[in-house]
């Protein structure tokens, strides 16, 4: 089977995507698959470069990759692909839409407000959230242009920085707690990982540099584990995820809050999903096998 590993792309996460893609190419079972690296440099590359492949393994991150656009093109071309479909991908990429759906489904998430320009900043609403707050692009990933803002004076600059990457900016309540992540594959939760960033929060350096954060499988107390699992699976269902996804949470005073959902989690040697899979003795190669097998079973018609 010819497996095209699609990486690169045009988002701010291009370099991370290439790291993921190269890791995947090296880890795929050579006896089962012919791995074909496909590096996208511009949108137009996609249709030409996927000709002749049997399956698209997506190692893309961010816009034009994680937002449902590539999934829609592949679906139109009749090429099966890994992970969530176009709708779920688009929803999960939009942080505001994700949180609206979670709130509708009574899944706990941090409070937030949205702005599209500095003129829309409502300092009273932000005061109501309580400082510090996180300010980030609505459709960004890997914590690109994400700022932890301690005071009113720093809000405008942080919003302007986030607006360089997106037309909408989220201003979100800061929940000081323990960050955990819940990888889900085929509707089942893998071991929960704790994330202890060396910096103030799990920023882009913490995520992708060796030693940027301590990440390890954590044993939660029984009641908390049950609630985390219930929330993670409910989130996965509400957002119509398929095959695999990663639900990120914060736990404050034994109370979990859903942060966001990654429909194409990183697949570098530092990535969280492979670390979690290793907790049930699933190798990186076996994880990729499972993703391909489950993705092929999902009806894309």
Swiss-Prot record:
What does the record note about the cofactor?
Binds 2 magnesium or manganese ions per subunit.
Domain ATP-grasp intervals: 99-293
**Main location group:** cytoplasm
Record-listed ATP binding positions: 126-181
Pfam families in alphabetical order: Dala_Dala_lig_C (PF07478), Dala_Dala_lig_N (PF01820)
Matches recorded under InterPro entries: ATP-grasp, ATP_grasp_subdomain_1, D-Ala_lig_Van_CS, D_ala_D_ala, Dala_Dala_lig_C, Dala_Dala_lig_N, PreATP-grasp_dom_sf
Q: Write the record's keywords in alphabetical order, separated by commas.
A: ATP-binding, Cell shape, Cell wall biogenesis/degradation, Cytoplasm, Ligase, Magnesium, Manganese, Metal-binding, Nucleotide-binding, Peptidoglycan synthesis
Q: Where in the cell is it found?
A: Cytoplasm
| Amino-acid positions noted as binding Mg(2+) 1 in the UniProt annotation, renumbered to this chain | 248, 260
Extract the Gene3D superfamilies matched here.
3.40.50.20, ATP-grasp fold, A domain, ATP-grasp fold, B domain
User: What NCBIfam families is this protein classified in?
Assistant: D_ala_D_alaTIGR (TIGR01205), PRK01372.1 (NF002378)
User: What name does UniProt use for this protein?
Assistant: D-alanine--D-alanine ligase
- State the organism of origin: Clostridium perfringens (strain SM101 / Type A)
């Amino acid at each position: 089977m010819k497996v095209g590993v699609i990486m690169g792309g045009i988002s701010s996460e291009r370099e991370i995507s290439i790291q993921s893609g190269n890791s995947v190419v090296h880890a795929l079972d050579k006896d089962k698959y012919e791995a074909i690296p496909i590096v996208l440099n511009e949108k137009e590359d996609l249709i030409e470069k996927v000709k002749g492949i049997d399956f698209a393994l997506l190692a893309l991150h961010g816009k034009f990759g994680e937002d449902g656009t590539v999934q829609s093109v592949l679906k139109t071309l009749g090429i099966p692909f890994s992970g969530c479909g176009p709708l779920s991908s688009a929803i999960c990429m939009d942080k505001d839409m994700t949180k609206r759906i979670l709130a509708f489904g009574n899944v706990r998430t941090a409070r937030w407000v949205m702005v599209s320009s500095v003129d829309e900043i409502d300092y009273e609403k932000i005061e109501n959230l309580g400082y510090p707050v996180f300010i980030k692009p609505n459709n960004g990933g890997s914590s690109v242009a994400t700022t932890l803002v301690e005071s009113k004076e720093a809000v405008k600059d942080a919003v302007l920085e986030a607006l360089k990457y997106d037309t909408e900016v989220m201003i979100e309540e800061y929940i000081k707690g323990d960050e955990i992540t819940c990888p889900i594959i085929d509707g089942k939760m893998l071991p929960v990982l704790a994330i202890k960033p060396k910096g103030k929060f799990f920023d882009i350096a913490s995520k992708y540099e060796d030693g940027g954060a301590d990440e390890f499988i954590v044993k939660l107390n029984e009641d908390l584990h049950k609630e985390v699992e219930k929330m993670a699976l409910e989130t996965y269902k509400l957002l119509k995820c398929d095959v695999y996804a990663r639900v990120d949470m914060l736990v404050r005073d034994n109370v979990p809050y859903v942060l966001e959902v990654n429909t194409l989690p990183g697949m570098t040697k530092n990535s969280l999903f492979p670390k979690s899979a290793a907790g049930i003795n699933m190798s990186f190669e076996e994880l990729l096998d499972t993703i391909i097998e489950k993705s092929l079973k999902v009806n894309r018609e």
